[in-house]
Structures are given as C-alpha cells and as structure tokens.
From Swiss-Prot:
Source organism superkingdom: Eukaryota
Domain VWFA: 314-507
Signal peptide (residue range): 1-28
Alphabetical keyword list: Glycoprotein, Secreted, Signal
Record Gene3D superfamilies: von Willebrand factor, type A domain (3.40.50.410)
Keyword Glycoprotein on entry: yes
Stated name of the protein: von Willebrand factor A domain-containing protein 7
Organism per entry: Bos taurus
PANTHER family per record: NG37 (PTHR14905), VON WILLEBRAND FACTOR A DOMAIN-CONTAINING PROTEIN 7 (PTHR14905:SF7)
Subcellular location as annotated: Secreted
Disordered: annotated span: 238-273
Name of the gene this protein is made from: VWA7
Glycosylation positions in this chain: 55, 773, 849
TM stretches of this protein: none
Any Pfam family the entry gives: VWA7_N
C-alpha cells in the first residue's frame, strides 16, 4: 500500500498523466454550476461529482476494452476536456448516446446540491462536517455509502443515486469546512471511509481554534496547532468562545468573536474567508470523490457500478400486460418482440440494461418481475398466458404505476390491453409519476373505442372510456395506438424501434387540420426518420424539401417504404433524409394521429430551478416542474455535442427556447438560452417569463438553434411540462425502513401565488398503513405549513423492497388546477449485523507531515496534520486511498 505522505511527484509517469485529467484549471463547493454568478471561477459540488464520475468511467473503459473495437488509450484524452459524449463515442462507437449516463450523473449532482437546500439537511452540522462534529459526520457519511450499496443491490438505482449524492456532499464538504488543507495535508484523509478507524488528533471542546478576523479574507486566523477542527455555522449549535466560524455572507456566527471563518467553498472572500485555499481543497475533494466511486465499484462489481451510473447507451424494456382471456394474440405479440430484441441485442452495447414485466387481470395486478438477465425475462414472459375472465374494465393504471416504480428513468413502457381502465381515479397520479420518472408510455389497444363489440362487459361503456390512456400518453410523451388482433404483431414492431434513442420531431400545427399540411424539419444530425399515422385515413402524402412526394401506396416509394396494418401506417424514410422542411398532408375521418420520430445523438435533458438565498450557499434548488409565483429558471444540458458538420467543425448550438401550449401548439413565448460554462459542456439556462408561471395548462419546450454549418436545428422535449400551484416537499427518516417499525415522514407545503384551499391525500405502494396529521390546509401567499406522516412497515415486509409514498394536494372541487404530487422512494431492509473489519495492516499512529510535496498543476480544459498513513480496511473493500492512481501503475 501507498503511505499517505508519499509525494505525488513520486507516483510515476502514468499517475501524473492521470492527474492532468483530475485537476480542473480554475473553475465545493457551492452546490451547482448555477451558483457561479455569485463566485465566478469557483469549483462546485456539481463539478467535483461529475469530474470524479468521468474519471472513474474512463478508468473502467481503459480496464475493459470494448468488444470488436480498439482499446482506449489514456494519452488520447490528455489535454482535452473530459466529456461524456467523447467517452461514449470512443468506447461504444460514434454517435452512441450518453443521455442516460448524463441523466444519472444529474440525479447524483442534484441530490448532492439538495443537501444545501432541503429543510431537513441544510442546517444539520453532521451532514456538512460543521461545528467540530467530525466523528458524527463520518458516521453519517459511511451510513449514506452503505445505503447506496444496499439500494443498488436492491436494483433501486434512483434511491442509490440520491444517497450517493448525499454521501459525496458530506465527503467534499470535509475538505472545505475543516482545516485539513491548512494543516498541510496533500492527500485525502485516510480514515474518513473506515468506520472502525478512530479519527485522531481532534480539537476538543475546550481547545481555542481561531483568532479574531475583521476582514473578509482571513488567511492567518487559525491558531498554531496540529489538531483537526471545523467551523460553526449559524446559531444551531451556538459557537463556543474561541472556536472558528464557517464564515461568509450567510453565516450568522461569523459576526460573533472570534469573527471571520475558515471555509474554502469558493474563490470569493465575501463567501469564503479562506478563499485562497479553494483550489487545494477542491483537489483533495476530487481525489476523495474518485476514491469513493472506486470503493463503490469494488463492492458492486463492474456491472452493478455501471448500472448505478447508467454507463450504457441502451435503455430498459418494460411491459405491462393484460392477461385476461381475450389477450392471447397480444401476449404472443409481446413475446415475439421481446424474443427478437433479446436475440438481436444480446452481447451488444444496445442490450437492455433491465427488464420489467407487470401483468394485470381484474381484480388484481402484479407482481412485478424485474431482472437484468434476458434469459430470466424471456422465461418469465414465456410462461405468461391469457387467463380466464374477460370482463371490461381492468386494473391497468395500477399495474402501470407499479411498472413506473420499478422502471429506470428515461425508459419506454409498453402497455398491451384490449380493455379500458377500472382504476381511472389514478390518472393524475400516474401522469405526474411518468413526468417525475421521465418515462414514455405507449398503449397498444386492440379495441376500437367507437365499436360496441369485443370482450364481455358488465355495463354499457362510454366511448370516452379510453381517455385516461390518452391523458397518460400525452403527459409522458407517448401515444395510444388502436389496432386489431390480426395486426397486433406487426404494430408491436414499434417496440423494437422505440427502445433505441429516439427524438420526436415537432409538427406545425401539432394536430391535423383540414386542407393544411403538417410541417416538420429535418437536420443533418437525424437518421432513420419514421412517420406514423393512425386513424380512419383515406389518403396522405409526404413531400421532402426538394418537392418529391410519396403517397399512401404500400411498398417502396421515392422517399421510403410504406407499411399498412389496418388503420396504422408507417413510412420509413430512406437514409440519409434530406435536410430542410418536410410536409405531410392527411385526409381522414375524425382526427388522425401523426407522429414523426428519428434517431440522433444530439438531444437534451432539462429540469427547473429556483434561486435560493436563505441557505448556507447560493444556488438553484432543482424542481421537476415550475411552481406558480416563483422565479424559475429552465436548466438545459445538451447531449451529443460531438455531432458536428465535419471533423473539427464548430459545435451545434441552441439560441432560444420556444414555449407552446399543449396539445394545440399555440406559441406562448420565446426566451433566450444563455450558456453556462464552456460551450462543450452544453449547459444552458433561461428565465421563464412571469406570464407563463401564471398558466395552469401544460406547455412544451422546443429548442431552436443551428448546427455547425449554420443550418437550423429543432429539438423538442419528449414530455410536456406544467406549472404546479404549490411546492410540496416530502422527506423520510434517516436510513432505511425496518420491518415491524413505524417511520416518521415530514411534509412541507408552500404557496407563492396566492390563497390556496387544499385537500391532502396520502398513499403508499405497497399498501402499508399511512397516517397524517394534515388533511386540509389553507395557505395565503408566501405561506407554508408543515405536516407529519407515519408509515407503518409490517413485520412481513420483504427486505430490499421499494416503498413509494405519495402525497397529493388538490384545490377545491371547483378549481381547474391539476393536483400537485410529491413522491418519496424508501427501501425496506432488515437490520444487518455490524460489519466485521480486519485489524489494521500496520500502525495507525498519526504521521504529521506539513511539508508540501513537489506537485505541479497541469493545464486542462476540464475542470501534514491529523491522521496518518494509509491503514486499515474500509467496510466494503481492501483497496487504499489512492486506489485509482495505484490501479494505473501497470499502464
């Protein structure tokens, strides 16, 4: 093992090469990059988290050469910005989408930043290594890492990423909030991840640690000692005499003697009295974050770790199947498509990462079957057959809700049924859940809603009985396709198409209007364009920018190949499609559906944020949907910017976003997109107009810009958004749920737009007993209320099972505002015995080393004190602190 005080210049050439990647040049410890208007040039928690993840991903790619492709070389990444798009293109092949990986990193980064914003965490000193609570902070850090591993092993990667974000926040805060850097330490603390190793040389309650400093910058306010300390923040707990403050604009304790502080969160003296040590603290926090990632990798294995960060271009395959007696053809169609996907993609980068199967059959639904093994999935699906019965309606939305709970974000879910939903009361909740999970739902319905024939019915059914499916499909960015039994196998072929990374091209107008063509735009970064039309169509034609047309005749045409399956038409446009404006003219009875999709690596992720100024640090608190009355930012992350007109050509860019009403498509406004950080990161922000934030209806986002050679680009968000009337925050207990216990939950509800009379409903899935002390609440503008919930976990609750708690806030019956939902995922785990750790390999005596090793900062476009040598074993592995660096030695 490598002693902790070995100078980095002695680590060898391969390690020094890696360090060029590790160290950003100038640009935690503000929460996210959106904080940097307050302190330009600072390194944030988001920077540290993403840089660490990219480095570990590169390490994983270097260790495992891609099948059928040349191995990656570390030298090819030196002196360049380390970007997810470049890593995926080098490993999986040009154009391989990194969208899911970047979305997973976004989940971790937002959970990290949320520690500074959530009411239950922002002022807890144990979660930030504040107030000299170093032992307690280490305990909470290790707990969060344990919870990350447990959630990942239970296949709940969303919860695992949330706990990982919390763990990384605490780990990174240690180097900014303590005096580890001031003690001259050049490497991460050797004991933070070792719960059985004592933290030595800690300042005690009676030890004075700081002198008074009346300036913003306080380089010499630490007293001359070799004890480890950290600053006090705010008033809880109160700062004892002689102790250091955190310091900065937001810290009330810094005005009490001794004034000043020691935090290194930013480059600004107004926020960070030890701003001059910001880069040194960031370097150690980055190395420690890499160490934590590697330790998780050793515990989860390469496959489990890859799932944790979604290091794959592939999506998941999720089926919700009606198994009533009339569904034989549909079940066979699902089997055929699943078998085709399994056989075609096995062993390739596009092999689905997870398979989810949920059956339903009145009066029941489930259980859910989840696996990453294609053979197990196929066996389970192959054993599924149509059962007796056949009454309409069925428990479809309950089964879909269960699938959403277990399907990874950014996935497609396919529902096969010939019945309307019996549980239509779940429609709003399922709509919100699809948007929270960013999952697209496609319903394949083998029943014409206008016919009265088909399966047995208990009553005369309304022609509007399928409207809940339409609502869920619209909210999720999916669609409802009506077909007949004889065509279901052909129509189901869209399953194989849809699990590729597709974008839906915006149409103008959004719906078919008589005698008016639909217009869509094709750019040079699109391929495999597909036009789907379904309805009572009598004729249609498609025209390309050159004026070449093709009608509805089946077979090969001048623009592509046309297939017809009853009332469903599909045109596969020849590659490469001509760039420019295309038109579609449809003549039909009723309102036909038209959908245009294409494959591309250039896409975008987005979320919303509100400026926070009352927490420990400035930043943007992330939201799934904007909240009425709150100044809201749209935050965009463009993926696939490696796509350009030619090698070395200029990057594509987006200049503004168009906001449109849903479903008609009327323009609600345009707002400019402002870049944040280097252009190659693809980070953009826009302020939503106040007029939009008073709109109760859904709206869509369309990004507009140019490719690298000046041609137009249009990308639409896959799902519509909506302004919600109130802010709901739901938080759970520390750790996991244990069978046979009652878990307390906290609820905060706030209004920023005016008086609200709200009815609150709570539910848990599975159906655990859930009680609340808040069922109705009246709020005035800028008023909030707190509530408590108690979740009873039965003795029979299965370990490693996921519980989803939902709180719904709905205005009075006369209100047209949609309800607001908050979702909380919790994991049930039986208490485990304490980990038995081997004895230290050698002495744990502190080794003081205040001399600085001969380390040189390398230019990259990316971004001796307490304790002693590298000793002992962490609770999950035997690797050492410099694991990643040691692992590169043989290279």
């Amino acid at each position: 093992m490598l002693p902790a005080d070995v100078p980095l210049c002695h680590l060898g050439p391969s390690v020094l090469l890696l360090l060029q990647l590790l160290l950003p040049s100038a640009s935690a410890f503000f929460p996210n990059i959106w904080s940097l208007l307050a302190a330009p040039g600072s390194i944030t928690h988001q920077d540290l988290t993403e840089e660490a993840a990219l480095n570990v991903t590169l390490h994983l790619f270097l260790e495992q050469p891609p099948p059928g492709r040349p191995p990656l070389r570390l030298e090819d990444f030196l002196g360049r910005t380390l970007l997810a798009d470049d890593l995926f293109a080098a490993y999986f092949g040009p154009g391989s989408p990194s969208r899911r990986f970047r979305a997973a990193l976004g989940e971790v980064s937002r959970a990290n930043a949320a520690q500074d914003f959530l009411p239950t965490s922002k002022n807890d000193p144990d979660l930030h290594f504040d107030a000299e609570r170093l032992g307690q902070g280490r305990t909470r850090l290790v707990e969060a890492l344990r919870e990350t591993v447990a959630a990942a092993k239970a296949l709940d990667y969303t919860l695992a990423r949330q706990r990982l974000g919390a763990a990384l926040h605490a780990l990174q805060d240690f180097y900014s909030h303590s005096n580890w850097v001031e003690l001259g330490r050049q490497q991460p603390h050797p004991h933070l991840l070792w719960p059985r190793q004592e933290l030595r040389s800690l300042a005690q309650a009676g030890d004075p640690t700081c002198s008074d400093c009346e300036e913003l910058s306080c380089p010499g306010n630490l007293l001359g000692f070799t004890l480890l300390t950290s600053g006090y923040f705010g008033t809880r707990p109160s700062k004892p005499p002689g102790k250091c403050s955190h310091g900065g604009h937001f810290d009330q304790s810094s005005s009490q003697p001794p004034r000043g502080g020691i935090n290194k969160d930013s480059t600004s003296p107004g926020f960070s009295p030890h701003h001059m040590l910001h880069l040194q603290a960031a370097k150690l926090a980055l190395l420690a974050s890499i160490q934590a990632f590697n330790l998780l990798q050793s515990r989860l294995g390469d496959r489990g770790f890859s799932r944790l960060l979604d290091i794959t271009p592939a999506s998941s395959l999720s089926f919700v199947l009606d198994t009533t007696g009339s569904m034989g053809e549909e079940i066979n169609a699902a089997k055929i498509q699943a078998r085709h996907i399994v056989e075609q993609r096995r062993g390739t980068p596009m092999e689905p990462t997870q398979y989810v199967l949920v059956p339903f059959h009145d009066p029941g639904f489930g259980p859910v079957f989840t696996t990453s093994d294609p053979d197990s999935f196929w066996q389970q699906l192959n054993e599924m057959h149509a059962l007796g019965g056949g009454d309409e309606p069925e428990m479809c939305l309950s089964a879909l809700e269960l699938a959403l709970l277990h399907t990874p974000p950014l996935s497609d879910i396919f529902v096969f049924t010939d019945a309307s939903p019996k549980d239509a009361f779940l429609t709003n909740r399922v709509e919100s859940l699809t948007q929270e999970r960013r999952c697209r739902v496609t319903f394949l319905v083998t029943e014409d809603p206008s016919r009265a024939q088909g399966r047995a019915r208990r009553e005369v059914l309304s022609p509007l009985r399928f409207e809940p499916y339409e609502a869920v499909a619209l909210a999720s960015g999916g669609e409802v396709i009506f077909t007949e039994d004889q065509y279901i196998q052909d129509v189901a072929a869209i399953v194989g198409d849809s699990i590729a990374d597709l974008v839906t091209l915006p149409l103008e107008p959004r719906v078919v209007v008589a005698e008016r063509p639909l217009v869509f735009r094709v750019d040079g970064l699109l391929q495999k364009v597909t036009v789907r039309i379904h309805g009572e169509v009598s004729s249609f034609w498609i025209r390309n920018p050159a004026g070449v047309s093709q009608g509805q005749e089946e077979g090969e045409g001048p623009l592509g190949h046309t297939h017809r399956f009853g009332r469903f038409w599909m045109v596969r446009v020849n590659d490469p499609p001509q760039s420019g404006t295309w038109e579609i003219q449809v003549t039909a009875k009723g309102t036909p559906r038209v959908r245009v999709q294409a494959q591309t690596s250039l896409d975008f992720l987005f979320h919303f944020g509100i400026p926070m100024e009352d927490g420990p640090h400035p930043g943007l608190y992330p939201l799934t949907q904007p909240v009425a009355g709150l100044q809201t930012q749209l935050l965009v992350e463009v993926t696939g910017l490696g796509s350009r007109g030619g090698p070395g050509g200029p990057l594509p860019h987006f200049s503004h976003v168009v906001l449109r009403g849903v479903p008609q498509g009327a323009e609600l406004g345009q707002v400019p997109l402002e870049p944040r950080g280097p252009p190659e990161r693809g980070l953009l922000a826009a302020s939503l107009p106040p007029t939009l934030l008073s709109t109760s209806g859904p709206f869509s986002l369309e990004l507009v810009g140019q490719d690298g050679v000046g041609r137009g680009l249009h990308r639409a968000a896959p799902q519509p958004c909506a302004v919600v009337p109130v802010l709901l925050e739901l938080s759970g207990p520390r750790g996991f749920l244990a069978p046979g216990t009652t878990a307390p939950l906290s609820l905060r509800i706030a209004s920023f737009s005016g008086p609200q009379d709200l009815h609150l409903r709570t539910s848990a899935k599975p159906s655990f007993a859930l009680t609340s002390n808040l069922s109705r609440v009246h709020l005035e503008q800028n008023e909030a209320a707190w509530g408590r919930l108690w979740l009873e976990v039965p003795d029979t609750a299965a370990s490693d099972s996921v519980v989803m708690v939902t709180v719904t806030a709905k205005n009075g019956e006369a209100s047209t505002m949609p309800p607001t939902h908050a979702f909380l995922r919790l994991l049930v785990q039986a208490p485990a015995p304490q980990d038995q750790l081997p004895a230290p390999a050698y002495s744990t005596d502190p080794v003081l080393n205040t001399s600085r090793p001969a380390f040189h900062f390398f230019t990259s476009v990316t971004q001796g004190g307490a304790g002693g040598g590298l000793v002992g074993n962490p609770w999950w592995t035997t690797f050492g602190v410099m694991l990643l660096l040691l692992g590169l030695g043989p290279w």
